[in-house]
C-alpha cells in the first residue's frame, strides 16, 4: 500500500473528533472499591500499583477494559520503583495484525515530567475505543491499517515526576551508539552522573528496560511491515 493511501486512512481516523477528548479531561476516577482490573489479555505486574499515584495509568487501564476484545494488549516489561511498586509498560494493538498491512505507532511518556504527551496518546486511544462501539467506517478502515499504542513508556519516571527513568537515565539518550560529530555539551548526552540531566547510563551496559520495551515493540510491530510511521508525543522542555 502506498504512502497516499496510508495518509488518507490516517486523516480519516483523525477526522471524526480524533482529539475530541482533551488531555485534561481524561477520566482518572477508578472503579469504586479499588484499583482498575487489568484486561484478561494483559499479564498483571507482580506488585499492585499504589492507588492514586499514577492517574494516567489508571485512566489507560480503564480504557483497556472498555476496549475488550477489540484490543490486543500486552505488558512488554515491568518497572520497579523505590517504593517497591511495579508498573507495567503496555503495548496496545488495534486493527489488522497482518504484516502486509501498514502500521502507525503512537508513543508517549518517554520523559516522566512531560505528562501531556502521554495524555494526548491516551486521549486518542480513548477516542478510538469509544468509536469502535458504533463507527462501522472505522472498523472498515482498521481492516487496512494497524494502530499500535505505547502511551506510557516511562511509568517510573512519571511516578517520580522526573524526566529520567528510576535509574536516572534519560531514555532519549539511552542507545548503544556514539555520535560521529560533536554534539552539544551535556544536552547531547553525558555519562558523568545520573544527577545531571541527559544521562545516558554507564558505558557498555544494556539499554534500560524501558528502552528495551520500546525497541521490542518497534521491531515486532512496525519494522517488518512494507510501510510504517511512528509519532512520539512530548511536551515542553522538562528537565
Language-model region placement:
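Active-site/substrate-binding loop(s) of hydrolase catalytic cores
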Residues: 116, 123, 127-239
